[in-house]
Amino acid sequence: MNLLCRDESCSVYQMKNETGDGTATYYEVYPGVGVMYNDFHMEHCPSRKFEQNTHTFAIHHCREGRVEWEVSNGAYLYLASGDIMLDSSATENNHCSFPVSHYHGITITISVPEAVEGLGDLLSLFSIDLEQIEQQFALKARPFIMHGKSVPDHVISELYQVPDNIRLEYLRVKILELLVTLRT
């Protein structure tokens, strides 16, 4: 993945291979919390890898197209339009593909120790316990997928139509809202 540009609010990365190209636009919303807008028109790309020994989980949302991940033991996970997947650094992602060579979605990454340290009071104010969310969805054992429409889908869908002049503030509010909805 090559860095195309970076400014005070975001970094834009490009990926190219023989099957097409894609971009990922990354915003650091809070310490340890990032939002990445993914736009891919290719058949496959390298899988995302968390650094070893990290305590991180991710929330993936598919807006359009389809994405598949090959995980351990030859099993596959897929997301289609409206689907959400939660996974953790414990998930082994071996291969990522786009069966229809088209994928638009969002990935939210949360480094639990970094987020708790930087946002402890704010998380407490909203009764958000990141480790409890991990336990609720058993993310250390396996990914969790929500197919179709759900309350979290509604919250994430609002992230696709944000005016640039309020993007960072809006993302901050919506990430907190999303984490509150995951508690239910």
Question: Where is each model-derived feature located?
Answer:
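N-terminal functional module of multi-domain proteins
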Residues: 2-104
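Alpha-helical bundle regulatory/interaction domains
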Residues: 70-184
